[in-house]
């Protein structure tokens, strides 16, 4: 489920809720439908751990006859710890090697393919906005479900901005868009989204401080075309400027903002 579907579940079943609480729970527990009927936080976490360990990991291990369970777990933990960060297969294999896990680039690529097929991981290719071509050297990876990411026994530190980025990524996929990561010279554009003839750009931030406003809006202002451009953050005040539309993330997710 995405957040609007969770809201619909609450409404259909006559359950009390606030939009803010739905969003907070979604950032913590993700969108697996079964967690909505569990009685308490402990039950939800136990359920998510069971899904991660029993269903996802064991299913992938057995379906693809993967023999190195330790490597698969370390690879997934590394990528879920670093959602939204650009990596190449070579840099991932080097990071695993420095952590004491020997592997090869080909094995990393093979295991990533299997994790994507298991829908616990999703890859966003990098797109050169000026050159209009895919950059094969690095990609970004996102969790297929935020809740599974949070119980994956990775770092206790949570980068809220990256979680919001992951949420927007999943939302745009759910809305039927093809989602890529944009590169404009030395600048990053969080998402370039396509659906049929439609194209748009999105920047995601947790809170838009003065410096952050200039960076997030400024990067979009440098794109020399007339496709729609958006900044999404947790800020309540509308900070739209120069034709670039700002949305509060809860409004974006729950009010059917058509972008």
Question: What role is predicted for each listed range?
Answer:
Residues 182-183, 206-250:
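Catalytic cores of nucleic-acid endonucleases
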Residues 36-198:
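Accessory nucleic acid-recognition modules appended to NTPase machines
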Residues 1-7:
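Alpha-helical sensor/transducer elements of the RecA-like P-loop NTPase core
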């Amino acid at each position: 489920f995405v957040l609007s579907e969770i809201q619909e579940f609450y409404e259909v079943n006559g359950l009390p809720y606030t939009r803010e609480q739905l969003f907070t729970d979604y950032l913590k527990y993700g969108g697996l439908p079964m967690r909505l009927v569990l009685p308490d936080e402990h039950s939800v976490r136990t359920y998510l751990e069971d899904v991660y360990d029993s269903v996802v990991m064991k299913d992938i291990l057995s379906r693809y006859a993967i023999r190195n369970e330790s490597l698969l777990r370390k690879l997934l933990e590394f990528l879920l710890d670093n959602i939204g960060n650009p990596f190449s297969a070579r840099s991932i294999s080097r990071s695993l090697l420095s952590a004491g896990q020997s592997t090869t680039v080909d094995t990393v690529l093979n295991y990533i393919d299997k994790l994507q097929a298991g829908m616990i991981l999703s890859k966003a290719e990098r797109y050169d906005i000026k050159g209009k071509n895919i950059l094969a050297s690095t990609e970004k990876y996102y969790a297929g479900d935020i809740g599974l990411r949070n119980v994956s026994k990775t770092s206790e530190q949570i980068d809220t901005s990256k979680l919001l980025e992951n949420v927007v990524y999943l939302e745009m996929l759910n809305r039927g868009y093809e989602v890529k990561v944009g590169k404009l010279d030395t600048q990053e554009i969080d998402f370039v989204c396509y659906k049929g003839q439609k194209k748009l750009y999105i920047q995601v931030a947790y809170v838009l401080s003065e410096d952050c406003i200039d960076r997030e809006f400024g990067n979009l202002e440098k794109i020399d075309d007339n496709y729609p451009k958006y900044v999404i953050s947790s800020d309540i005040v509308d900070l739209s400027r120069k034709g670039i539309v700002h949305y509060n993330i809860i409004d974006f997710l729950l009010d059917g903002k058509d972008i």
